[in-house]
C-alpha cells in the first residue's frame, strides 16, 4: 500500500476540450474549460488547480488565466471516455471499471404514452409537459399550473433521464420519492432502459419565486457488474461517498455516504473526511458546475464556481497527509459556451497529487476513465478489474 487514503474529487462536467470521438456526438468544438477561460480572460484565476498542473495538460493551447506551472506540483493528463454515452452515470461507472457498453434509452420527443399512463395511474395525478426541457425553465413555465392542479411535471433532456418536478406544497417529498421509485422500477428494462430517474422538488408560490430545493434524489440503474468500489469494500477498506456518488452507484460498494447541498458543502464534507482517520477511498462529486451552470449555459456562473472551488481546494490540500493521494477529474463536459443545453463529449482533466511526491510529470492521454479506478486498486493491493491500466508506478 503506497497511500493509506485516496481522495477523488469529480468536478462534474468540467471537460478540457473535444474528445477524439466528439463528432459521433455532434460535439466538435466543445471546450468547457477553454470557453470559460475565454469568457473571463485573465480574470480567470485557479491558483491551486494551476499549481497542481491543470494548465500543463494543454500547454500548447492554454486556458486563459491558467498557464502551465513551472514546475507543476502534481501529475497531469487527460482521460478519454469509452462508454457509449456522456451521462454522469456512464462517466462514474467507467471510472470505477465498468464502462457502459449497452446504449441507454433516449427520448428526445418525450416518453411514450404507455409510460405516461402508468405514471398517472400509479400516482393518481395527471402528467404535464413530457418533452425535453431545462429544469429551471420548466418550473418557470409550468410551475404555477403544477401548483394549481397537483399534476406531475415530467420532462427529459439530451441525456437518458426521466425527471419529475413537483412543488413540495402540493406533493410532499415522500410522495414524490415514492412516485420516482415506481418510475425507476418500470424503466429498468428495454424498451426504456433509462439511466436515471430524478426527483426534482421545488418551492415557492409563483414563477418569480420558484426555486429547486436541495432534496433532489437520483434513482440510477444498479451497476450491471462489479465495480472497483465493490472490490475495495470486499477487501475491507473504507469507501466514503460524498454528494451524488451514492445515488449514481445505487449504494453499491459504499461503506458510508453523505448527500450534499452544494459544491461548498461537498468540499466541507471532503475536508471532514480528510480530518477523519480511515483507510481506503473517499469519492466526491461536485454537481453544481453541471446542474447550475453547464446546462444553463452560464459561463460567468460556471467560472465563479470553479474559482470558489479552487479556494476550498487550498483548504483540502492543507489538511492532506503525506500518505494521502488526491485525484481530481471530471465525468464528461458541459460547455456553457456551446450550443444546446446538454452534456458535451470531451476529454476530462486528470490531476494527481501527494505532498511526498515530486510531481511535474505527464500522465499522457489515458484511453479510458477506468485507469483511475485501476490505479486505486493497485494502490490497495486489490485484484485488478477487467478494464483500465494503472498509472500508480508513474507516481514517484
Curated annotation (Swiss-Prot):
The free-text cofactor remark is: Binds 2 manganese ions.
Principal subcellular localisation of the protein:
cytoplasm
Q: Which residues bind Mn(2+) 2?
A: 290, 295, 343
Q: Which reaction is catalysed here? A: 2-deoxy-alpha-D-ribose 1-phosphate = 2-deoxy-D-ribose 5-phosphate; alpha-D-ribose 1-phosphate = D-ribose 5-phosphate
Write out the annotated subcellular location: Cytoplasm
Domain of life the protein comes from: Bacteria
Pathway annotation from the record:
Carbohydrate degradation; 2-deoxy-D-ribose 1-phosphate degradation; D-glyceraldehyde 3-phosphate and acetaldehyde from 2-deoxy-alpha-D-ribose 1-phosphate: step 1/2
One of this protein's GO BP terms?
5-phosphoribose 1-diphosphate biosynthetic process
What Gene Ontology terms describe where this protein resides (cellular component)? cytosol
For this UniProt record, the keywords arranged alphabetically read as follows:
Cytoplasm, Isomerase, Manganese, Metal-binding
InterPro entries under this entry?
Alkaline_phosphatase_core_sf, DeoB, Metalloenzyme, Phosphopentomutase_DeoB_cap_sf
Asked if the record carries the keyword Metal-binding, the reply is yes
Give the GO molecular function terms.
magnesium ion binding; manganese ion binding; phosphopentomutase activity
Name the cofactor(s) required for activity, per the record. Mn(2+)
- Enzyme's top EC category: isomerase
UniProt-listed Enzyme Commission number(s): 5.4.2.7
Task: State where Mn(2+) 1 binds.
Answer: 12, 331-332
- Give the similarity note: Belongs to the phosphopentomutase family.
Q: What does this protein do?
A: Isomerase that catalyzes the conversion of deoxy-ribose 1-phosphate (dRib-1-P) and ribose 1-phosphate (Rib-1-P) to deoxy-ribose 5-phosphate (dRib-5-P) and ribose 5-phosphate (Rib-5-P), respectively.
Query: What is the official name of this protein in its record?
Result: Phosphopentomutase
Amino acid at each position: 500500500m503506497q497511500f493509506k487514503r485516496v481522495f477523488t474529487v469529480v468536478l462534474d462536467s468540467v471537460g478540457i476540450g473535444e474528445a477524439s470521438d466528439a463528432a459521433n456526438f455532434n460535439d466538435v468544438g466543445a471546450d468547457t474549460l477553454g470557453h470559460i477561460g475565454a469568457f473571463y480572460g485573465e480574470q480567470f484565476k485557479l491558483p491551486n488547480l494551476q499549481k497542481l498542473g491543470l494548465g500543463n495538460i494543454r500547454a500548447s493551447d492554454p486556458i486563459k488565466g491558467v498557464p502551465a506551472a513551472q514546475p507543476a506540483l502534481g501529475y497531469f493528463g487527460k482521460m478519454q471516455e469509452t462508454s457509449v454515452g456522456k451521462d454522469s452515470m456512464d462517466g462514474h461507472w467507467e471510472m470505477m471499471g465498468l464502462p457502459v457498453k449497452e446504449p441507454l434509452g433516449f427520448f428526445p420527443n418525450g416518453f411514450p404514452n404507455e409510460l405516461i399512463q402508468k405514471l398517472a395511474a400509479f400516482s393518481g395525478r395527471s402528467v404535464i409537459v413530457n418533452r425535453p426541457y431545462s429544469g429551471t425553465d420548466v418550473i418557470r413555465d409550468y410551475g404555477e399550473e403544477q401548483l394549481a392542479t397537483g399534476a406531475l411535471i415530467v420532462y427529459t433532456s439530451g441525456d437518458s433521464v426521466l425527471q419529475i418536478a413537483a412543488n413540495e406544497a402540493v406533493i410532499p417529498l415522500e410522495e414524490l420519492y415514492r412516485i420516482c421509485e415506481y418510475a425507476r422500477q418500470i424503466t429498468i428494462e428495454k424498451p426504456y432502459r433509462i439511466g436515471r430517474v430524478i426527483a426534482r422538488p421545488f418551492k415557492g408560490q409563483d414563477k418569480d419565486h420558484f426555486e429547486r430545493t436541495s432534496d433532489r434524489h437520483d434513482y440510477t440503474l444498479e451497476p450491471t457488474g462489479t465495480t472497483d468500489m465493490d472490490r475495495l469494500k470486499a477487501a475491507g477498506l473504507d469507501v466514503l461517498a460524498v454528494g451524488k456518488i451514492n445515488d449514481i452507484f445505487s449504494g453499491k460498494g459504499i461503506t458510508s455516504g453523505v448527500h450534499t447541498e452544494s459544491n461548498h458543502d461537498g468540499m466541507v464534507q471532503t475536508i471532514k473526511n480528510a480530518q477523519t482517520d480511515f483507510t481506503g477511498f473517499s469519492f466526491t462529486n461536485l454537481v453544481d458546475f453541471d446542474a447550475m451552470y453547464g446546462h444553463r449555459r452560464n459561463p460567468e456562473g460556471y467560472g465563479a464556481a470553479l474559482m470558489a472551488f479552487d479556494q476550498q481546494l487550498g483548504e483540502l490540500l492543507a489538511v492532506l497527509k503525506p500518505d494521502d493521494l488526491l485525484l481530481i477529474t471530471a465525468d464528461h463536459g458541459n460547455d456553457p459556451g456551446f450550443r444546446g443545453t446538454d452534456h458535451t463529449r470531451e476529454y476530462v482533466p486528470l490531476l494527481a497529487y501527494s505532498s511526498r511526491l515530486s510531481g511535474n510529470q505527464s500522465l499522457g492521454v489515458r484511453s479510458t476513465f477506468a485507469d483511475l479506478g485501476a490505479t486505486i486498486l493497485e494502490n490497495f493491493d486489490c485484484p485488478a478489474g477487467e478494464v483500465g491500466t494503472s498509472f500508480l508506478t508513474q507516481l514517484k
